[in-house]
């Protein structure tokens, strides 16, 4: 009798677990964003081109509408054939060069936004520029700002981890948030705070002031040279300026460096939700 009851209980338990798994799958599925299955006419094609770029050029709406939504989206996300500028450029006495004269960097970029055959790349470049906000007013080097812009473009649709690693050692960002002055002798908390509050976790996320201080220690070691003719140059990591002692960040302890700092932020429980919500807000 006891054997039969145990067998029945075991069977009921397995059935209960199976139902539980089914419920979990169902609830997870219902939480996903439904795929649009409505019509894809002129209005929808125009909306897609405005959302994924900077609006349609002559002929774009007709072309995208003919492709259909699925193929049009795939073409925007997985652009092939190289990036080219379409149509006539701005009329100037001299060729448009980003580092030529004051203001040409802005005109050069706006021209790319308008004429690029890869609009989502330029849209994402602008998004990353806003996400990891810097300004030449603080950096003081048009050359470094243009290099950062090109870096955002190369990483426009790539892996966010790689982008964060590139941003963390980017010369313009190092100057903007004093990363090039952050040493074991005098830790600077600017980037350590911003990488959590603005870039990966959000204001009010689950981190402490002690985490900020420990992040600053992990991020020590970047520096640069100065030349009176050239200005800021030769940005690099110098081991002797890095704090190689043990640190505790988000409750984890280790001899963390700047790459660990990025990794720990991306592994934090608040990162995924912050990332999706912030990226979604741009569209």
Q: Would you name each region that the model predicts?
A:
Residues 2-31, 77, 88-92, 102-110, ...:
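Active-site substrate-binding loop specific to GH73 endo-beta-N-acetylglucosaminidase modules
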Residues 44, 51-155:
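N-terminal accessory alpha/beta regions
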Residues 21, 42, 46, 60, ...:
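A generic structural signal for solvent-exposed, polar alpha-helical segments
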Residues 2-8, 14-32, 37-51, 55-59, ...:
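Terminal end segments
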Residues 35-44, 100, 115-122, 186, ...:
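Structural motif
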């Amino acid at each position: 009798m006891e054997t039969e009851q145990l067998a029945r209980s075991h069977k009921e338990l397995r059935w209960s677990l199976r139902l539980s798994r089914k419920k979990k799958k169902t609830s997870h599925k219902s939480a996903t964003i439904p795929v649009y299955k409505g019509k894809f006419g002129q209005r929808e094609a125009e909306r897609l081109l405005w959302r994924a770029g900077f609006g349609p050029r002559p002929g774009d709406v007709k072309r995208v509408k003919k492709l259909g939504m699925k193929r049009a989206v795939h073409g925007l996300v997985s652009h092939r054939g190289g990036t080219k500028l379409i149509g006539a450029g701005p009329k100037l006495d001299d060729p448009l060069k980003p580092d030529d004269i004051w203001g040409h960097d802005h005109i050069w970029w706006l021209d790319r936004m308008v004429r690029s055959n890869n609009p989502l790349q330029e849209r994402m470049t602008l998004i990353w520029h806003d996400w990891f906000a810097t300004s030449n007013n603080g950096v003081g080097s048009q050359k470094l700002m243009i290099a950062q812009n090109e870096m955002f473009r190369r990483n426009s649709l790539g892996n966010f981890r790689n982008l964060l690693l590139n941003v963390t050692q980017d010369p313009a960002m190092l100057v903007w948030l004093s990363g090039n002055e952050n040493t074991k002798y005098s830790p600077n908390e600017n980037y350590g705070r911003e990488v959590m509050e603005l870039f990966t976790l959000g204001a009010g996320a689950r981190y402490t002031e002690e985490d900020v201080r420990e992040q600053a220690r992990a991020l020590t070691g970047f520096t640069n040279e100065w030349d009176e003719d050239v200005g800021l140059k030769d940005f690099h990591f110098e081991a002797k300026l890095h704090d190689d002692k043990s640190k505790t960040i988000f409750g984890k302890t280790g001899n963390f460096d700047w790459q660990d700092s990025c990794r720990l932020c991306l592994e934090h429980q608040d990162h995924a939700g912050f990332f999706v919500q912030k990226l979604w807000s741009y569209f």
